[in-house]
Amino acid sequence: MYINREIDHILLDWKMSDRHKPLILRGVRQCGKTSAVRNLSQQFGDYIELNLEKEPGIGKIFEGELNMNKIINRLELHFSKRISSGTLLFIDEIQECPRAITALRYFYEDRPELYVIAAGSLLEFVLDGKKNDTPVDFPVGRVRSIFMYPFSFTEFLHGTGKEILADYLKHTDFSETPNDAHQELLEEYKIFLTVGGMPEAVREYAETGSIQACQQIHRDIILNFKDDFNKYSRNVSPEIIRKVFDYATHHVCSQTKSSSAITGVSAYYFDLCIDLLKKAC
């Protein structure tokens, strides 16, 4: 079940625009980027999706000369499908192939009749060279970046069947909010704080109403998040990042001295890990 997101309108406006630069959809893992693009794909007659993480070998299509005609031919052979004018081409997990990021420039310059969206997480590490030791030749001015986030409270209300309350929230200035409406908003907000804004958890709550099931989803997401720590930097071990992450989650809103926060972790590495975690989000 796809729950409508606020970004859907932005993506649709991009489709309708005469000058549609390739899009880079950025955001933390599992915030709904892929689902949003697949939902948009229903507005296109032809759609091709390639995932550079699931199919690492497909990245070879972008090796060598970035000749768009040759790249399109390779894609057509790979998918056994013609790529004609108006096709939506979705390059998912593009951070796995820096060369594909550079290629977006030439999609814009040489094949403007195609609609191209790239999505990825941890892109900041690739763009500054922290992952591959070499900064990416980013196509400045030839692409448009959009940041996607987890569900907002308004999106949560719409997704859980509280459309009337969501519309009320959108149009009220809270100067004359009836007590019953205010109380209902508070109750729903408490639920939102518990369920969170990750799409899988919101979908689970909308379908089952089970907070316990949502908490299991949260645990799975955190484990997956930690599994990515080895991708953050070659200059700090994943174990140190994990220690700082665990420390931070238990000291929210508290004052901390980085020099004495965690035994065995210097102020330099503590601050470095905090910066890496912020960049990942």
Label each region the model flagged.
Residues 1-16:
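N-terminal pre-Walker A segment at the start of P-loop NTPase domains
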Residues 25:
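Hydrophobic anchor at the beta1->P-loop junction of P-loop NTPases
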Residues 33:
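Conserved lysine of the Walker
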Residues 36, 40:
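Hydrophobic positions on the alpha1 helix immediately C-terminal to the Walker A/P-loop
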Residues 54-85:
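Short glycine-rich substrate-engagement loop in P-loop NTPases that contacts/grips substrate
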Residues 90, 115-121, 147:
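Structural recognition of the conserved hydrophobic beta-strand(s) that form the central parallel beta-sheet
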Residues 124-144, 157-162:
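Short regulatory helix/loop adjacent to the ATP-binding pocket of P-loop NTPases
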Residues 158-281:
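Interdomain hinge/linker elements that couple catalytic modules in large macromolecular machines
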